[in-house]
């Protein structure tokens, strides 16, 4: 029996000083054993995003998928740190689950830390991130 897979992409920015790199946040939801896996060279604080994202989704009145969620932060060679990827991870997961439009989500650059209640908190380095978004032709941040 084939397992049904659902995929979605969102985008964020990784900053090293004033230089930024676009990070593709890919989410896959598969019909295998439930779990939440984050891959692509995340640091310890980013690994904690799994718990923030899960709580924020549930406390926003949405349903976190009861399936295996795999989130890949690409390119894997770029170091990712901090909580600014929370929003991109959450919208990518929700788009893969069908709760948001994948096409709409992929047109934006998503930057923000999530509170456990689902609120979006500001992050540092927004100006350099906006400049990178402009360079790659993304009008929505």
Regions found by a protein language model. Name each.
Residues 1-140:
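Peripheral, non-AAA+ core regions of ATP-driven protein-machinery
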